């Protein structure tokens, strides 16, 4: 295997005439999946930038269709051993290490494909690569006939996908909404459903197997949106609040990025928007597609809402392009009682409303939607109830990395609550979090780099008990002891230990999923010591087939924690 800067795997070298013929830039606007299946990319030189999750998928795809693939990553081979081994046996050249000039990897390429965090405008790519990509973009814009096109993994997928797609974006709630939407669509056995994107599964892996009658649900992050030139059939927005300001600089810039999916939506499709979020609601009318609004109160005509504790629809018609119709709704447009949802918290009710709208747009019968929604238990690392041990409920919300998400998690459970928080600061305003923590939590146990900042914030808001712990396992034990003591002498049936960090994970963990697994392992150890049996994978996992396997972490590229909400 490669071991050092610039080392490559053996390849059959093309002739000079072959190079001239195959290095002509690929016309992406004319490329179709049918043409790819018939050999349109065979022998064409393609450069893949980045060897993380999306880069691996791109390398597999282009190799499978006969392209001559070169992979560039600034990290040395020793750090990429697992990824390189995953591509063993394929005719792929590796150009690895900080000494490799990225420009040399695409000088004779017909196409350059990238992971989401490798793009000219974002600081997540290293400066030399960012400058080289910016120059490539300028050459393309100037009409340079030798400049290869630049395409992201997700944009390539959306360009070639033959099936209707549902794109889900927003600041928080994306993963739950996407997974529940997929579970609802899967209730119709006549269509296969694929779930991927930022949720952890690069969908380009599925391209060659897709058929027009399939359904695809894509979670789309703010890293992926700027790379898109094609939209989805249906675009779903959960909410848009301040986040990732370390990448975008201002709230306004972040909001401009988030508009992208609405601007690109298929005009024959639909926009599904949260009427209770003013930024999201203002997107109505973009892209020329009709809008379906949802809210946790009386539904807007043509939308989804709640009446008398029932989720109801007010005239949501199925999309003509997906074929078929929908069964008649019950009295008052009833679909299912709110109480049948297994997802805790008002924010999860909003997520469910959006997913119900998706089901209706694709012609699902209300009883099928009801069964799927009522059977959906949630997504790993998002308000995941791991276990209840001696009257203490342990909740893994490792993906709660910003104040709004933590506040929603605190409101989802009854007191007493002990909050575990801390990690690497994301550069967002944490001040609004202080009052809700002081109001809802009896104590906080803090870890990581942001612990001092959070301690000052929580104490100044009036929270009397704030402790620091050197690591997460210690924090879980301290929080457990505090929670058990807080429950004594009260009528509360359970106390809750809630991991909802209000911070990224990179100071102590690989990513938020690694942090969540560490939390669950600590809970399992406490349970074992007390003779309580609990699975290390936790108790709250999706029941539906199209969800991810446990441990699939939506991270990619050059250090961007894409999946953290």
Predicted regions and their residues:
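N-terminal leader/targeting and accessory segments in enzymes
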Residues: 2-152, 344, 538-542, 546
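Nucleotide phosphate-binding/pyrophosphate-handling subdomain across enzymes
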Residues: 29-45, 58-65, 332-441, 456-459
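Active-site beta-alpha connecting loops in nucleotide-dependent enzymes
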Residues: 41-60, 70-82, 379, 398-472, ...
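Residue-level signal for inorganic ion chemistry
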Residues: 62, 112, 168, 198, ...
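Beta-strand->loop->alpha-helix junctions that form or flank phosphate-binding loops
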Residues: 70-75, 95-99, 149-156, 194-196, ...
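Phosphate-binding loop of NTP-binding sites
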Residues: 102-109, 116, 120-275, 279-290, ...
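Short glycine-rich anion-binding loops that position phosphate/pyrophosphate groups of nucleotides
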Residues: 116-120, 173, 222-223, 242-243, ...
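Glycine/aspartate-rich loop-and-adjacent alpha/beta segment that forms the canonical ThDP
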Residues: 502-528
């Amino acid at each position: 295997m490669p071991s050092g800067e610039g080392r490559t795997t053996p390849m059959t070298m093309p002739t000079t005439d072959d190079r001239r013929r195959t290095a002509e830039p690929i016309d992406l606007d004319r490329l179709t999946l049918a043409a790819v299946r018939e050999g349109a990319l065979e022998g064409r030189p393609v450069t893949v930038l980045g060897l993380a999750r999306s880069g691996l998928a791109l390398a597999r795809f282009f190799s499978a269709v006969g392209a001559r693939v070169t992979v560039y990553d600034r990290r040395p081979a020793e750090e990429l051993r697992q990824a390189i081994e995953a591509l063993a046996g394929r005719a792929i050249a590796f150009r690895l290490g900080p000494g490799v000039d990225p420009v040399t990897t695409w000088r004779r390429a017909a196409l350059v494909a990238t992971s989401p965090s490798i793009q000219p405008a974002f600081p997540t790519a290293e400066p030399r690569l960012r400058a080289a990509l910016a120059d490539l973009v300028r050459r393309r814009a100037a009409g340079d006939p030798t400049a290869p096109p630049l395409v992201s993994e997700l944009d390539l997928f959306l360009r070639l996908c033959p099936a209707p797609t549902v794109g889900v974006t927003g600041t928080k709630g994306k993963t739950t909404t996407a997974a529940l939407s997929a579970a609802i669509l899967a209730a119709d056995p006549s269509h296969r459903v694929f779930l991927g994107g930022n949720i952890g599964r690069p969908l380009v892996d599925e391209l060659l197997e897709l058929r027009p009658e399939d359904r695809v649900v894509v979670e789309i992050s703010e890293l992926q949106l700027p790379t898109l030139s094609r939209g989805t059939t249906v675009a779903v927005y959960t909410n848009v609040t301040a986040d990732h300001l370390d990448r975008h600089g201002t709230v306004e810039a972040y909001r401009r990025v988030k508009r992208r999916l609405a601007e690109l939506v298929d005009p024959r499709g639909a926009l599904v928007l949260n009427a209770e979020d003013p930024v999201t609601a203002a997107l109505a009318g973009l892209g020329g597609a009709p809008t379906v609004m949802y809210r946790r109160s009386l539904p807007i005509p043509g939308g989804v809402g709640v009446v008398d504790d029932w989720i109801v629809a007010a005239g949501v018609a199925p999309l003509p392009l997906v074929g078929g119709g929908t069964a008649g709704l019950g009295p008052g447009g009833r679909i299912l009682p709110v109480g049948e949802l297994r997802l805790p918290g008002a924010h999860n009710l909003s997520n469910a409303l959006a997913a119900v709208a998706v089901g209706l747009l694709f012609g699902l019968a209300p009883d099928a939607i009801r069964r799927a929604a009522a059977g959906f238990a949630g997504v790993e690392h998002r308000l995941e109830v791991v276990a209840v041990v001696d009257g203490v409920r342990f909740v893994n919300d490792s993906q709660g990395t910003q104040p709004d998400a933590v506040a929603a998690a605190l409101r989802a459970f009854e007191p007493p609550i002990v909050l575990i928080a801390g990690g690497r600061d994301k550069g967002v305003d944490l001040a609004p979090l202080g009052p809700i923590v002081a109001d809802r939590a009896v104590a906080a146990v803090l870890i990581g780099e942001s612990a001092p900042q959070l301690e000052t914030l929580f104490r100044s808001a009036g929270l009397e008990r704030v402790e620091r712990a050197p690591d997460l396992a210690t924090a879980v034990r301290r929080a457990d002891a505090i929670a058990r003591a807080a429950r004594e002498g009260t009528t509360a049936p359970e106390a809750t230990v809630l991991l909802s960090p209000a911070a990224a994970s990179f100071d102590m963990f690989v990513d938020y999923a690694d942090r969540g697994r560490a939390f669950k392992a600590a809970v399992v150890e406490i349970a074992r010591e007390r003779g309580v049996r609990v699975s290390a994978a936790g108790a709250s996992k999706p029941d539906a087939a199209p969800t991810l396997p446990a441990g699939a972490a939506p991270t990619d590229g050059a250090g961007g924690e894409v999946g953290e909400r």
